[in-house]
A protein has these predicted regions:
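Terminal low-complexity tails and localization/encapsulation signals of metabolic enzymes
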Residues: 1-54, 87, 91, 139-160
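Glycine-rich loop-to-alpha-helix module at the N-terminal edge of alpha/beta enzyme cores
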Residues: 49-140, 149
């Protein structure tokens, strides 16, 4: 086993430790919850088909609660000034970049993708948040950047 592989596996196991004894649930209305379904399942790594943690299955009630929470939060977010949205989205992107190695190693164990690919995916995700952060101040008025080959419009309705 190469030094890099051994090192990556050791670091991945450290990051995965927090999932071993804690069932991963849902994040609804600003809180972590195990939901109402009551059924959990093993999250198996494709590397060797062993359990790396447990995950709660979502129920119809959990989906309804998440949609209701999104609807409740929608007006507040829609009325948040573009400069504040920009700050929050950039802060989130900063956190993703700070934890890109952790995200890459955990996701690699979770889905079997190469670590280098998952790290780039995390960095790309952060770049997407930064792109929309930069657009937030100018989008506050419901307008968007015009391009001749596109028709742009805004629908202010939460979709979930």
């Amino acid at each position: 086993m190469s030094d890099t592989l051994a090192s990556n596996l050791a670091r991945a196991q450290q990051y995965l430790e927090r999932f071993k004894n804690n069932t991963t649930g849902h994040y609804i209305k600003g809180e972590f919850t195990l939901g109402t379904g009551g059924r959990e399942y093993d999250n198996l790594t494709p590397t060797d088909n062993t359990a790396i943690g447990k995950v709660m299955a979502g129920s119809t009630q959990d989906v309804d609660a998440a949609c209701e929470a999104a609807q409740e939060a929608f007006e507040g977010w829609a009325n948040t000034p573009g400069s504040e949205r920009k700050r929050l989205l950039n802060k989130f992107a900063d956190r993703v970049v700070e934890r890109a190695d952790e995200i890459a190693l955990v996701e690699s164990m979770d889905c079997g993708q190469a670590v280098r690919y998952m790290k780039k995916a995390a960095e790309r995700g952060a770049a997407n948040f930064r792109f929309f952060a930069d657009k937030a101040p100018e989008a506050q008025d419901g307008q968007s950047t015009q391009q001749p080959e596109h028709t742009n419009f805004t629908v202010r309705k939460a979709i979930g």
